[in-house]
Amino acid sequence: MRLFSLAAAVLLAAVVSAPTASAAELREVTGFGSNPGALRMFEYVPDGLPEGRPVVVAMHGCTQDAAGYGTGAGWVELAERAQFTLVLPQQEQLNNANRCFNWFQAGDTARGSGEAESIAQMVQHALGETGGDPARVYATGLSAGGAMTAVMLAAYPDVFAGGGIVAGVPFGCATSVVDAFTCMNPGKDRTPEQWGEAVRGASSHQGPWPTLSVWHGTTDSTVAPANQRELVEQWTDVHGIPATPTSTDTIAGYPHEVYADSSGRTLVETVAITGMGHGQPIDPGSGEEQCGQAGAYLLDVDVCAAWHLSESWGL
């Protein structure tokens, strides 16, 4: 495990925490549940937040902390601007030496078990505390956090309305340390049905299923861009729609593919960030569509993934 954890510090790298005024308003929440995964919960609740607002869960990658990712990716400022509750799970070194979420361990990815259950308990606590809307709960994350996002959407599809995976891998790709490296690069090529069966087998849920937005850099050598396509195949199969885009356009000049149902509702989408390596797309600034703070694996590519995710979710 130590070998994997040390390697993961590079392979599923994290954002360096940077203190800001917004991050200082984050607070740790204890006693949110039985916490079988022994995670820490941090939360940002805007002052005067009315009841009935959404909840977003944002998950970091290896070696980073909740505040660093929440601030760097832009989620803290968006929570304030759009008025939603932000939940930031944080891994502990006792679980993983480099604080990677254990997205490749069966005991931490099965419904009702380990880290996945801890995150689900955080959601329920946040909903109860703020009077949030249980129909508008979303999950997102970078790299290892993106892989854990796939876990949460698959294991708790009744909890999450949608998700955003940045530089992640499909659910069920790995069940061991060795598998984890293969999943990241070069990735695993399975049929859409095989990928879909992994999700359908993760719970007794029969639908509706969470929507999914997948962001990935085209020159990512840490988590192969092929994983973006495999995620599309997995979730279009789950939704019962073809893995062929119904429309294509661009977002901030980057290729954007939409996979919609017969009514035109977007169920799966991808954004391929041309020329970007491994990291979270951000666009620092004060403009309406801008957010984030540049740093390690927080890449200023003139588009903020967090803002576009929040817009697609109607936050």
Regions found by a protein language model. Give the residues of each.
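Short beta-strand/loop motif that positions the catalytic acidic residue
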Residues: 214-216, 220
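Conserved alpha/beta-hydrolase "nucleophile elbow" surrounding the catalytic nucleophile
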Residues: 60, 140-146, 217
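Short glycine-enriched nucleophile-adjacent loop
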Residues: 146-158, 164-167
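Active-site glycine-rich loops that stabilize anionic/oxyanionic intermediates
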Residues: 53, 60-65, 276
